[in-house]
Amino acid sequence: MEQFECINVEEAHQKLHQQTAVLVDIRDPQSYAMGHTPGAFHLTNDTLGAFMRDNDFDTAVMVMCYHGNSSKGAAQYLLQQGFDKVYSVDGGFDAWHRHFPAEVARGTF
């Protein structure tokens, strides 16, 4: 995959529950703590190294931000780092929260 793909929250939900992709959330720490998708890895400059160590480059990665804009740049960056399959989640956490309000975790872990 030379270019990331955009997927909607329903596709992201399916991939997450089928465990065919991991989800990273690139929002700021306060926003992440106030609500995030259960199982999402909080990807920051400080956690990038750990994420890359803990995941094989053939792991499919879905990137989520606030509304689906910033995730595109992060998705392209992860491709450039060597990940084979990267997706940007259209609508971001805002869309996730609207579609799956019962599936929102709180806290920093």
From Swiss-Prot:
Report the top EC class in one word: transferase
| Tree of life domain | Bacteria
The reply on keyword Cytoplasm is: yes
Q: Where in the cell is it found?
A: Cytoplasm
Name the keywords, alphabetized: Cytoplasm, Transferase
Q: Which Pfam families does this UniProt record tie to the protein?
A: Rhodanese
* Classification via SUPFAM superfamilies: Rhodanese/Cell cycle control phosphatase
> EC no.?
2.8.1.1
Known catalytic reactions: thiosulfate + hydrogen cyanide = thiocyanate + sulfite + 2 H(+); thiosulfate + [thioredoxin]-dithiol = [thioredoxin]-disulfide + hydrogen sulfide + sulfite + 2 H(+)
Catalytic residues as annotated in Swiss-Prot or TrEMBL: 65 (cysteine persulfide intermediate)
Q: Name one GO cellular component term.
A: cytoplasm
Q: Show where the Rhodanese domain sits.
A: 17-105
Q: Does the keyword Oxidoreductase apply?
A: no
GO molecular function terms attached to this record: thiosulfate-cyanide sulfurtransferase activity
Q: What's an example Gene Ontology biological process for this entry?
A: glycerol metabolic process
Q: Which InterPro entries does this entry report, sorted A to Z?
A: GlpE_sulfurtransferase (IPR050229), Rhodanese-like_dom (IPR001763), Rhodanese-like_dom_sf (IPR036873), Thiosulf_sulfurTrfase (IPR023695)
> What does the UniProt function comment say about this protein?
Transferase that catalyzes the transfer of sulfur from thiosulfate to thiophilic acceptors such as cyanide or dithiols. May function in a CysM-independent thiosulfate assimilation pathway by catalyzing the conversion of thiosulfate to sulfite, which can then be used for L-cysteine biosynthesis.
Q: Which family does it belong to?
A: Belongs to the GlpE family.
Q: By what name is this protein known?
A: Thiosulfate sulfurtransferase GlpE
Source organism (scientific name): Klebsiella pneumoniae subsp. pneumoniae (strain ATCC 700721 / MGH 78578)
